[in-house]
Amino acid sequence: MRYTKIVLLLTAVLLFVACGDANERYVRKAVYIMDHHGLYAQGEQWKATKKAALAEHPTTHEEAVQIVQQALQVAGGKHSFIMPADMVTVNVTSEWEMPSVELRDGIAVIYLPPFSGNDDEGRRYVQTVLDALPDTLSGAVIDLRGNSGGNMYPMIAAVHRFLPDDLLRFRNRKNSMPVDNDYILNVVGIARQAMIDCPVAILTNELTASSGEATLLCFRGLQNVRVFGTPTAGYASSNVPYPMPDGSQLVLTVGSDVARTGEEFCDAPIVPDSLTESPMEEAIAWLLKQ
């Protein structure tokens, strides 16, 4: 009986130590990823945060996650988060909304909703817009209100006929990567179509975020473009998911968006050219004057 109790006690101790080691390894791996890739993982604040995180000895997985979340806000900012394992394994469904195009006396009104579908659905998203566009227009409205993000490539590909090359750049701590139409279309698997030369009005609001903001920035600096509405959410940055031992993902902000103007955007809202609560009406009125 005593022997059995001793064995059970030793087993409990070993399990406790093993769990503690696993929790510390979880924190160390996350800190390593943040230290090497996090956009803001530099300077004294990060050094102090890193030191504090590694000095912790979490006894539960929940404690380890909390430590990582606190460090993540410093290394990656507000756009970074931990995606739980059960969300990582969820199959992408077709519950996303399709874009739409309405023609109004020579003006195309294009609604681009957020998108997180698969490759085939992405091509459907793009073709829905391209198939509805005539070759000649007097103007276009691109409605990004409520576009909270997802996969930016179908969004940009859907409106590539209004865009010249050199769309924008992604800048991380070490270098920057240019993004142009050919790259976008190659990723989506859509053939390039002829450019439509017309003025473009873009609508934004406080729900325009992430990939929605990246789509907006592709038009920044073009002379025949004007933005109407309210400031965006301020998530114009690049995220990368890193797998963690528990099946979750560390979704870390690794770069910022740079417009063709050279302006760099990340956590600050993008302010429209015309602040208005009636963006569609003002956009149409502006296009009719061009």
Give the residues covered by each predicted segment.
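C-terminal motif of bacterial Sec signal peptides marking the signal peptidase cleavage site
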Residues: 17-18
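STAS-typified acidic loop motif
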Residues: 99-123
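Short acidic catalytic loops
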Residues: 110-111, 132-149, 202-203
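A short, well-ordered alpha-helical element
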Residues: 118-138
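Sec-dependent signal peptide recognition
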Residues: 2-9
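Terminal peptide-recognition signature
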Residues: 30, 71, 110, 142, ...
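Gly/Ser/Thr-rich loop/hinge elements
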Residues: 149-201, 237-243, 247, 254-258, ...
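Extended, small/polar residue-biased N-terminal targeting/export presequences
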Residues: 39-105
